[in-house]
Amino acid sequence: MQEQYSPRAVEAAAQQKWQKTAAFKAVEDASRPKYYALSMFPYPSGKLHMGHVRNYTITDVLARFKRLQGFNVLQPMGWDAFGLPAENAAMKNGGAPAAWTYANIEYMKTQLDSLGFALDWERELATCKPDYYRWEQWLFTRLFEKGVIYKKNGVVNWDPVDQTVLANEQVVDGRGWRSGALVEKREIPMYYFRITDYAEQLLADLDKLDGWPEQVKTMQRNWIGKSYGSDVVFPYDEASIGHAGELKVYTTRPDTLMGATYVAVAAEHPLATQAAAGNAALQAFIAECKSGSVAEADVAKMEKKGMDTGLSVIHPLTGERLPVWVANYVLWGYGEGAVMAVPAHDERDFEFANKYQLPIKQVIALASGDGEYDAANWQEWYGAKDDTVKTVNSGKYDGLGYQAAFDAIIGDLQAKSLGQKKTQYRLRDWGISRQRYWGCPIPIIHCPSCGDVPVPEKDLPVTLPENVIPDGAGSPLAKMPEFYETSCPKCGGAAKRETDTMDTFVESSWYYARYASPKCDTAMVDKQAADYWLQVDQYVGGIEHAILHLLYARFFHKLMRDEGLVSSDEPFKSLLTQGMVVCETFYRDLPNGTKDWIAPQDVILERDAKGKIVAAKHRVDGQPVVVGGIEKMSKSKNNGVDPQEFIEKYGADTARLFMMFAAPPEQSLEWSDAGVEGAFRFLKRLWKTAREHVEAGVVAPYASGELNASQKELRFKLHGTIQKVADDYGRRQQFNTAIAAVMELLNAYDKADTSGDIGRAVAQEVLEAATLLLSPIVPHVCDGIWNALKPGTELLAQAWPKVDEAALVKSEIELMVQVCGKLRGSVTVAADAAKDAIEAAALAHENVIKFMEGKPAKKIIVVPGRLVNIVV
């Protein structure tokens, strides 16, 4: 062994060996239990950040641990390679997105290798490669023919700068998440997945996911949003509208129908269009409504506005005429684009009615008789739907509880054919059309005679041309006749290819399954390989993907199951959502009102005795800087740490050790230079300890009966540590406590008697085990140490150390001794010592004698294995 720990040399040697021997290649083996560990694959943005390092280290620790336990481990890696950033980079740099993407992939791959991850690179995939998206297109055509994918006009968020449709989640405070432009509403033809057909399965199967965080399951339940209610039909008031018809709404509160005082419709509703004819003010208001976001979150936050159409509908039970209002909070793409308003018992309607002086009719009161209704001030009980309330001012329905009123009113609506009990979901069908270039082409041909025709399987893939430089004004594909001009597969006539591409969430919804057989060119997945590897045993990624990616992947798994491609119902058996990597931020205010963010390494800090920052100044000019607080590492706040620079200074193992030791995986990890230095010191100490042992010469075997008390104590500590670390890695997934346990073991090693042949033999046992225990976290240094401890053997070929149960049986135990409840000393007795022998040993302790002050013992309490309390 080298005298000093040299991360660069140690890590290069291990990585070269692993690469040369294809150490992490996974092959199906029915004779062994499998373990599929997967990190959410990265977008090839150019460089890894510390969030990536933490995510992939967690997965790698679990994969390496399971390998030691004898599992056949698969840990693949690939690239979520389509997407808008590549187009933006292309426009900025004047190159094709493909070239930018492939260059980034090559660089990031070297970064991943430098971190020592146990990846099977033979299974690498990139979603922008035709051999990948070909199968996505194949599934699209299958689902289109089955009706699971359909086309319809949809109201969407349109970003006028990026010239594309945005998902609701890409709209932040009414603006596009990338461009910052005010989002408009537009109605365009789009392709949709009928994810709503799977809503009940997606909801029910959450109960099967015992290995998922409850928080994520709750978020998905809320997103799917199952509710029970009723469709309610309000017939048109022909006198005001001019013709017969009906307005249908869905409500979860039919019990409050008697309190409906108006209805509200979306700006795109036919009644709004009719009323706006010849009404300039209403036309202007409708135009204003159409310029906002269609995201529910944005609608919930914005000021509620409305305008009376002058039209009316008829209340289905009372026959009253109710005014029809256009309101900006009603979305055309949701349900019927209309809602019934019960201002007395819905907070949003309450605010709206008070703003526009609309009637507020109370139809619910507290069953206890307490509480007066105040139409000017909202109170929580107004919206209650439980046994605490009963109906009032509701005619024949008066005095009913929530459920009784619910059932009675729906019954009467059904009898009059003006309503129907209904279960509904908040979940909406998934619109996947994107007016973008760098994505998977939608495999549809538009024929004037035959309509929309799926591309035949023999003609797949529809290949995306890669030598294109977008200009930002719409999709380049729509300007390329060489791409879109084609012939109809049915009639042979002139036709046009679809120029929209798919939402990039489609690619990331099935990649985990493709890893089972990435080179299969006859099917989307090889059924035999998929049945061996799937489900993914452990999926690791950020909680920001709790809803969309994870919901879409669950949906796709069910689609593939229904196509006979996979056998299971769910893709991911266990899910670990790691916390963010955060760091201090520093800045100076600039004259233009913006902030100049200063990198932490350029700041000199002054701290108080408790470690709190009391002053900060710039390293260059010595002038003060503002402490901005702890935030997620990001380019925008200039508080990131470049993994590559870090590895060059400290090595990958220090990064891995610090990441796993600084915080439990599910919590945020605060970056600490002192913590990094501490991790580096520990690895140097580990190396030095092993080197000193190895340099002392060959170790002879020993018999357990030859051990002295110190050596027995060390073996007791060792085998207890093996037990604990296995539990920390496996069941608890708390890697910081596993590291702490090994540190404690090495502290015990330093204090133990490791002299002589027997002492050195015990030392060898401890160091071998400690090396194996730490190897999932710091694999390079452990590989180097193992080569020195056990020449001619390979660490990767070893098994997890076995617990010697005999070592955990102590022949002697230490008991604390108290006098009148106060600790006065300790005694060592035989583990099987009788009560009177324990009492005698305690009474004979010199410090105990001193504090008994010659008084007789009134009572002696022995707590087995723990303490003796003498009462005088």
UniProtKB/Swiss-Prot annotation:
Enzyme Commission numbers on file: 6.1.1.4
Residues involved in ATP binding: 635
InterPro entries assigned to the protein according to its UniProt record, in alphabetical order: aa-tRNA-synth_I_CS, aa-tRNA-synth_Ia, Leu-tRNA-ligase, Leu_tRNA-synth_edit, M/V/L/I-tRNA-synth_anticd-bd, Methionyl/Leucyl_tRNA_Synth, Rossmann-like_a/b/a_fold, tRNAsynth_Ia_anticodon-bd
One GO term describing the cellular component: cytosol
GO molecular function, a single term: leucine-tRNA ligase activity
Short motif 'HIGH' region, span: 42-52
Extent of motif 'KMSKS' region: 632-636
Keyword Protein biosynthesis found: yes
Catalytic activity: tRNA(Leu) + L-leucine + ATP = L-leucyl-tRNA(Leu) + AMP + diphosphate
Cross-referenced Pfam families: Anticodon_1, tRNA-synt_1, tRNA-synt_1_2, tRNA-synt_1g
Enzyme class: ligase
Localisation per UniProt entry: Cytoplasm
PROSITE patterns, A to Z: AA_TRNA_LIGASE_I
Keywords recorded for this protein, A-Z: Aminoacyl-tRNA synthetase, ATP-binding, Cytoplasm, Ligase, Nucleotide-binding, Protein biosynthesis
HAMAP family in the cross-refs: Leu_tRNA_synth_B
Entry-linked PANTHER family: LEUCINE--TRNA LIGASE, MITOCHONDRIAL, LEUCYL-TRNA SYNTHETASE
Protein name: Leucine--tRNA ligase
Originating organism: Chromobacterium violaceum (strain ATCC 12472 / DSM 30191 / JCM 1249 / CCUG 213 / NBRC 12614 / NCIMB 9131 / NCTC 9757 / MK)
